A protein has these predicted regions:
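Boundary/linker segments flanking structured domains
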Residues: 1-63, 67-207
């Protein structure tokens, strides 16, 4: 029998427990979403018909994961006693709005799981989710979580996400990428097929 000391705050132990708690939460539509309070982590899932997402469509594999903490939380300015308000709810609402603005996505094709967590532990949980699932909107198609850069900053290149999923009004003001949406979608298919080959355990259906 192993006599290795159990440390409940060890990275793998804690982060794994949070991820399991998140995945045990009910999956709910991204839109509409009832208001709730708190900071935490979330996972967004896709069940639509776009062919380049078919490997994960309708499966319990997130297309995107993220976190929401109060302003100043990343610098340690908000701790155990701070009331974060509705930051996690607002983040999910922002994502639903972004999806609703683009041409080739429908809000009804997205659902989410979210878990309210004490802000100090949120980043650890998000990091573990990213490592475990390698969501395509986090690892390849960057830009989903971007916001309007504001006047005077529109000379920057448009994101991969906004090139593949055109429609956010402010993104139209940015400089076009050289890579086409078709080229990006091909890379998405390659990425997801490789993920399925290399990480078959996350594609197994739950009992």
């Amino acid at each position: 029998m192993s006599t290795e000391e159990f440390d409940p705050l060890r990275y793998e132990t804690f982060a794994g427990a949070v991820v399991r708690a998140l995945l045990e939460r009910p999956m709910v539509p991204l839109e509409p979403l009832d208001r709730f309070e708190g900071a935490g982590v979330y996972a967004i899932f896709y069940k639509g018909a776009l062919p380049f997402y078919r490997v994960i469509s309708g499966r319990d594999i997130p297309i995107y994961v993220g976190q929401a903490i109060p302003e100043g939380g990343r610098k340690g300015g908000k701790g155990l006693g701070h009331q974060p308000g509705g930051v996690l709810y607002k983040r999910l609402r922002d994502h639903a709005k972004s999806i609703g603005q683009v041409k080739n996505l429908r809000a009804e094709d997205f659902s989410c799981r979210y878990l309210v967590v004490v802000p100090v532990w949120v980043s650890i949980a998000e990091e573990f989710l990213l490592k475990t699932y390698q969501p395509v909107w986090n690892h390849l198609v960057d830009g989903f979580g971007n916001h309007d850069p504001g006047r005077g900053r529109y000379d920057q290149e448009n994101s991969l996400w906004d090139t593949l999923h055109e429609g956010r009004p402010w993104a139209k003001k940015l400089r076009a990428r050289k890579e086409s949406a078709g080229g990006i979608s091909s890379r998405v298919e390659e990425f997801l097929n490789k993920l399925k080959r290399e990480r078959p355990e996350i594609f197994r259906e739950k009992a």
